[in-house]
């Protein structure tokens, strides 16, 4: 069987200072 690939949730873009 195929192993489920863990996909991390997309991180919000950090504000440029």
Swiss-Prot record:
User: Which keywords does UniProt give here?
Assistant: Antibiotic, Antimicrobial, Immunity, Innate immunity, Secreted
**Can you name this protein?**
Apidaecin
Briefly, what is this protein's role? Antibacterial peptide active against Gram-negative bacteria.
Spell out the InterPro entries in the cross-references. Apidaecin (IPR004828)
Q: Where in the cell is it found?
A: Secreted
The Swiss-Prot or TrEMBL record describes its family as follows: Belongs to the apidaecin family.
Any GO BP annotation:
defense response to bacterium
Tell me which species this is from.
Bombus pascuorum (Common carder bumblebee)
What does the induction field say? By bacterial infection.
Lineage, top-rank taxon, reads Eukaryota
Q: Name one GO cellular component term.
A: extracellular region
